[in-house]
Amino acid sequence: MKAFPAGFLWGGAIAANQVEGAWQEDGKGPSTSDMQPNGVFGELVERKEGDSALKDVAIDFYHRYPEDVALFAEMGFNCLRISIAWTRIFPNGDESTPNEAGLAFYDDLFDELAGHGITPLVTLSHYEMPWGLVKEYGGWGSRETIRCFEHYARTVFSRYQNKVKLWLTFNEINMSLHAPMTGVGLPNSSSKAEVYQAIHHQLVASALAVKACHEIIPDAKIGNMLLGGLMYPLSCKPEDVFETLQQNRSWAFFGDVQCRGAYPGYMLRYFRDNGIEIEITDADREALRTTVDFISFSYYMSGCVTADEALNEQLRGNILSMVPNPHLPSSEWGWQIDPLGLRTLLNMMWDRWQKPLFIVENGLGAKDHVEADGSIHDDYRIAYMNDHLLQMREAIEDGVEMLGYTSWGPIDLVSASKAEISKRYGFIYVDREDDGSGTLARSRKKSFFWYRDVIASNGANLE
């Protein structure tokens, strides 16, 4: 089979709050993720001394990263997506001087990656922000958080300008509509007007970070990151088709702002029709004109949309409130598996924005069984990924420009949605259970060797 383009980036993606642990070490402050010990849809819990959560240790990447990076290198990674924990750098979020211990940790991590020939792709904010900014200012509901984020971004750009040339601003920025506390630091009960105002502040902050990156690291590239939720009409009824258009716009509008530099007309109408008034200043409009260099996104599933509200209420099942597609199988967690949908989405994004695309999350969460000899035969994961990578290559043949692919969770980690480790994505098994038991020992699954061979052939061995 045909190989992927020369220079294609292969690797995996992790997030600080799902792997690092060490949640109170070396001056780190509490984040919104720390206050959501049961996941992004769980209740908010202000932590007390002596309590514990799975993410407090996670997989202890903070102390074990040399071992993990060596395993990534053994698979042939030439790229690793990570996130910086904002609260390691500014524990409360509004300090003027950064925490040197936090900066030093990422210095060491980037040096370790460089020693193995692995390019870092760094997310500035991945499903967390300083809890101090939530308590003091109301999270992204306040313009003060824009200032704090820009200061944080400029600090890390300056510190790592010789070590990191690929950046992302906010992880799955459109998830704020579904999980406001995780996305913008607002209570999940917040009104649409409050959430969209906070999202506006975040979009402005993202654009200011892009501008700062271009100023401080002229040879760097910086992108956005979307949750790619492909939706099909449940039927060919015109009402279902139009409702699907509207639902796809609900996430694509973030990309429209970040790629085109202004709010699209359909979103301004949505605000008018729903009585939502967003404070947008002339300075905001000027800031938004700075657009991203590339588009990154996650892709796990697709679903269907219907204009029939009663049917929608009866059938919808996953985090994007889509209804199941009767033509697709589902994972153990109810996420519908649709490899061809990835090709469709890649083409849609390329046609819409004409910017290079980077798949920075994709994978199968499943319960893995450890055999008596310690082996793990995760053929289901291999099949899932093989089918998606084949469709990705078809999209490239369609003319889509792609930078790379980083699978989600190349090593088992604590899931974002429900803060459980039993939902495993990794090629590398971590001996830890949802109750916190286990040795944290690492071992290679069957998929480890499969992905190693895919990377070694630059995708030519896919079948």
Question: Predicted regions span which residues?
Answer:
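Active-site region of glycoside hydrolase catalytic domains
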Residues: 1-49, 73, 92-94, 103-463
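Active-site mouth loops of central-metabolism enzymes
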Residues: 50-64, 141-143
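Catalytic domains of carbohydrate-active enzymes, especially glycoside hydrolases
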Residues: 60, 64-85, 290, 294
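Glycine-rich, proline-tolerant flexible connector loops at the mouths of alpha/beta enzymes
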Residues: 84-98
